[in-house]
Design a protein with these regions (language model features):
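Catalytic machinery of carbohydrate-active enzymes
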Residues: 1-200
């Protein structure tokens, strides 16, 4: 611990960690945000009904959750407008119960079976888009270069948000809860930008 490195404040945690690693290992941090992640077929999930979106509804503390009624309104709008399914992964029994509460009476909202991290990565990689609260899987979806919308209710996305790009946006802030309509429209903008980038 004899050597220290100065990392500028005012950037989010991912950027600051990238900058720190660049200094420690002596390279210039690339301006682009391409992480180059791939998901091995070993994580393959069977019977995923395409097209689908993923709702990352669970997080480390209750103050970072988005209200169940907002999730339900968003999922209904996604299904009505996009004719799609929405998968809800979970990691423990409390998260499973929340997923079941969100999906109750919505046949297109599918509570996932328990899965490992590789399977979760596969689910994210093959989704049209991902919506999520402040959680690690949201950052994984961002690193996989998927269309993502981060929902922040108790943390500042400037510090902990996804890496913003044409296909990745943050909404909300401490005490600022975004509406389902705003999340939907922002997600559609991200999906459109992703589809536009694939046109040759």
């Amino acid at each position: 611990y004899a050597k220290t490195y100065a990392v500028p404040k005012g950037k989010n945690a991912v950027w600051r960690n990238r900058e720190l690693f660049a200094q420690v290992f002596g390279y210039a941090m690339p301006e682009t945000q391409v992480f180059g992640l791939t998901v091995p077929e070993a994580g393959r999930l069977k019977n995923l009904e395409q097209p689908y979106y993923v709702a990352l509804h669970a997080t480390s503390r209750d103050s970072k959750l988005w209200p169940v009624e907002n999730w339900r309104a968003l999922l209904q709008k996604l299904n009505e407008e996009q004719q799609c399914n929405v998968y809800l992964p979970w990691g423990n029994e409390a998260e499973k119960a929340r997923a079941e509460q969100i999906a109750d009476g919505l046949p297109f909202a599918i509570v996932c079976d328990k899965m490992n991290l590789l399977q979760a990565a596969y689910l994210l990689k093959h989704a049209v888009g991902i919506i999520g609260v402040d959680t690690g899987l949201l950052h994984l979806a961002n690193a996989l270069e998927k269309p993502v919308v981060g929902i922040y209710t108790d943390t500042d996305p400037i510090k902990t948000g996804v890496q913003v790009s044409a296909v990745a946006k943050n909404l909300g802030n401490i005490g600022q809860i975004p509406t389902a309509d705003l999340v939907y429209q922002t997600l559609m903008d991200c999906v459109a930008a992703d589809e536009g980038s694939k046109v040759v």
